[in-house]
């Protein structure tokens, strides 16, 4: 039991809390730099032992310490729990007692206590009533006791640190639950087809389009979606990168795209849907190519497509270019007419079901509220009457010069 108490006392320390927070920030940075939730071969290929990232991050380190899934690793969750405990202990043992003390009426019945205060005045006025009236005009709460007066205002300024801690606790709990309990699914859905997702929804793709810039490079890609629930409610939206679909607790992100099939017509009679295979080029090239080998009329040809503009390249077995064709254009091969009719595309989507996002939003809302409350000054004034002289003592947690100016005005009016 003593060990637990000592451990909790260690956690109830600002320095320890900052160290834990820095450790979480470092882990989060690694989780941002290192691709998450990829297969083992990906890390072996991209983080070789011979060329470590930052001179120390290798595939062995990533796989051994769970850096391939940082946010769901046991040690990251443990750091979150430690920070939660530290914030909770600080709130209970420091912030709440400070608030309780602030709410108590604090009387100083001896003018000799003036040494306690950096802000102090004296006036020849013997009327506490007049001074009290001026304080009330400045929205102070007043408490009388014989020849002594205690006044305060801005108690909400003392509440803001507690709300900060409380909001951070909510954000951390919401983020942890979101990471461990939320569900994510990635899928490619062909245009004009639907697919069940996350056991509860059906996603249907009406259309998929790509916008190109003046240099012929991809500028943006769009998916026109219909999301249907088991309750038969539907929502439709055209999404694109950085503009997801949000419905209830599900969010759908536009992530990728693919070309699945090439529809061809031979001799204006027979239609065939030819599957295309994506080819990843070496040296990290960003260009995309889809290819298929066809045996047409005793001749092997390669159909190559690199976008949805409708341009098809035909190569022979020697990798020599035979011709370049567009969709709907007729070409002749060994006496037969061939038409490339259609490219069948699919859109790459990420579906994220998370019931705890509202909890995270609530935490950030409270954090913003606490930031506004922190600008409220908590000010206290003591009036101590001694014969024909009245002493004015003051204390504030911020805006000290404005507070001094206010007390000076009150003293001068008397």
From Swiss-Prot:
Q: Which cysteines are joined by disulfide bonds?
A: none
Keywords, in A-Z order: Chloroplast, Cytochrome c-type biogenesis, Membrane, Plastid, Thylakoid, Transmembrane, Transmembrane helix
Q: How does it sit in the membrane?
A: Multi-pass membrane protein
> What are the transmembrane regions?
14-34, 73-93, 159-179
Q: What is its main location?
A: plastid
The compartments listed are: Plastid, Chloroplast thylakoid membrane
Superkingdom of source: Eukaryota
Q: Which GO terms describe its cellular component?
A: chloroplast thylakoid membrane
- Gene Ontology terms: biological process: cytochrome complex assembly
Does the record carry Phosphoprotein as a key word?
no
Report the Pfam families cross-referenced here.
ResB
Q: What does this protein do?
A: Required during biogenesis of c-type cytochromes (cytochrome c6 and cytochrome f) at the step of heme attachment.
Q: Which family is this protein grouped under?
A: Belongs to the Ccs1/CcsB family.
Q: Could you give the subunit structure recorded for this chain? A: May interact with CcsA.
The record's annotation in HAMAP family points to: CytC_Ccs1
What name does the UniProt record give this protein?
A: Cytochrome c biogenesis protein Ccs1
State the species of origin. Guillardia theta (Cryptophyte)
């Amino acid at each position: 039991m003593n060990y637990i108490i000592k451990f909790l006392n260690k956690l109830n320390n600002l320095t320890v809390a900052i160290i834990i927070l820095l450790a979480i920030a470092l882990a989060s940075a690694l989780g941002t730099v290192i691709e998450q939730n990829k297969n083992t071969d990906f890390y072996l290929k991209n983080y070789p032992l011979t060329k470590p990232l930052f001179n120390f991050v290798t595939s062995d380190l990533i796989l051994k310490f769970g850096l391939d899934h940082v946010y769901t690793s046991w040690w990251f969750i443990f750091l979150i729990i430690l920070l939660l405990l530290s914030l909770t202990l600080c709130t209970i043992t420091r912030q709440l007692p400070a608030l309780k003390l602030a709410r108590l009426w604090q009387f100083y019945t001896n003018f000799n206590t003036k040494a306690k205060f950096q802000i102090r005045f004296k006036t020849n006025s013997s009327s506490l009533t007049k001074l009290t009236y001026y304080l009330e005009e400045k929205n102070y709460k007043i408490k009388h006791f014989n020849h002594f007066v205690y006044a305060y205002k801005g108690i909400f300024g003392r509440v803001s640190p507690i709300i900060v801690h409380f909001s951070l606790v909510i954000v951390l709990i919401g983020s942890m639950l979101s990471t461990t309990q939320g569900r994510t699914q990635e899928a490619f859905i062909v245009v004009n087809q639907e697919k069940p997702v996350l056991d509860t929804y059906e996603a249907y793709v009406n259309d998929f389009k790509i916008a190109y810039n003046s240099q012929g490079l991809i500028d943006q890609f769009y998916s026109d979606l219909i999301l249907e629930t088991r309750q038969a409610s539907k929502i439709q939206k055209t999404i694109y990168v950085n503009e997801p679909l949000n419905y209830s607790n599900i969010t759908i992100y536009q992530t990728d795209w693919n070309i699945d099939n090439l529809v061809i017509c031979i001799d204006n009679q027979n239609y065939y849907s030819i599957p295309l295979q994506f080819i990843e080029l070496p040296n990290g090239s960003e260009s995309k190519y889809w290819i298929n080998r066809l045996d047409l009329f005793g001749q092997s040809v390669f159909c190559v497509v690199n976008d949805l503009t409708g341009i098809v390249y035909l190569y022979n077995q020697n990798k020599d270019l035979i011709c370049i064709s567009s969709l709907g254009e007729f070409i002749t091969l060994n006496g037969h007419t061939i038409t490339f009719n259609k490219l069948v595309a699919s859109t790459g989507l990420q579906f994220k079901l998370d019931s705890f996002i509202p909890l995270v939003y609530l935490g950030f809302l409270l954090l913003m509220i606490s930031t506004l409350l922190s600008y409220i000054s908590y000010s206290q004034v003591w009036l101590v009457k001694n014969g024909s002289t009245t002493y004015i003592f003051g204390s504030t947690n911020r805006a000290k010069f404005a507070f001094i100016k206010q007390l000076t005005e009150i003293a001068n009016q008397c």
